[in-house]
Amino acid sequence: MGRNSGFTFKQFHVDHDRCAMKVGTDGILLGAWAPVTNARRVLDIGSGSGLIALMLAQRSPADCRIDAVELDSNAARQARENAAASPWHERVTVIESAIQTYQATPYDLIVSNPPYFVAGQSFRDPARALARHTGGLDSRDLLAACDRLLAPNGEVALVVPTAMADEILCISADYDLHAVCYTAVITRAGKEANRVLLRLGRGLNKCEQGEIVIHSADGTYSDRYIQLTSPFYLKM
């Protein structure tokens, strides 16, 4: 934890008190895992506080430009402030927009930590409801936007609940986007996976399968999780 209610990482700070969805393990995993090395244009859909965009800015080449699209006005303003205070303020642009109407030059990499609660669940905070209900951005809207905005040789990287992975892969196939990498995320050794990190690319591909265990059986962070996140966490 850092100043105020935000998080201080090794190279940047994220305030998230005006964002419906807070900094969490899903976003940190995606920001550390997504394949950004060869990307020159990156899009973060539903950026929230800007966490993933800033993590990718830290990991990417100096000539990589990152656009972070966020629908909620308060979150977009806070993401803009977080980006402005970061070392990569010239490379990260926050755009307040619905992704369904957003237009831009195609991207080499599109990332998203999308909403995943189904309609019918209630939240006291309307902004949290908007951020997490699939009524705000459903899987087909998300993947249609990826199809429209992705460069021919680009990739999409997502983190989703395991229960949603089959739906995502079924819909993505309608847009000729298929799994390149399927990585199960296991919270603790011996447990079932509850999240999946997905990479999608154009055309049928050989899919690399693997897993990331966050905590070993004794409760300590696994070597793989430390390898992924140590460039970011202060005490790792």
UniProtKB/Swiss-Prot annotation:
EC number of this enzyme: 2.1.1.223
Keyword Methyltransferase: yes
GO biological process, one term: tRNA processing
Presence of keyword Transferase: yes
Location(s), subcellular: Cytoplasm
Enzyme superclass (EC): transferase
Molecular function per GO: nucleic acid binding; tRNA (adenine-N6)-methyltransferase activity
Pfam families: MTS
Reaction(s) the record says it catalyses: adenosine(37) in tRNA1(Val) + S-adenosyl-L-methionine = N(6)-methyladenosine(37) in tRNA1(Val) + S-adenosyl-L-homocysteine + H(+)
Similarity comment: family membership: Belongs to the methyltransferase superfamily. tRNA (adenine-N(6)-)-methyltransferase family.
Function: Specifically methylates the adenine in position 37 of tRNA(1)(Val) (anticodon cmo5UAC).
The protein, known as: tRNA1(Val) (adenine(37)-N6)-methyltransferase
Species name: Aeromonas hydrophila subsp. hydrophila (strain ATCC 7966 / DSM 30187 / BCRC 13018 / CCUG 14551 / JCM 1027 / KCTC 2358 / NCIMB 9240 / NCTC 8049)
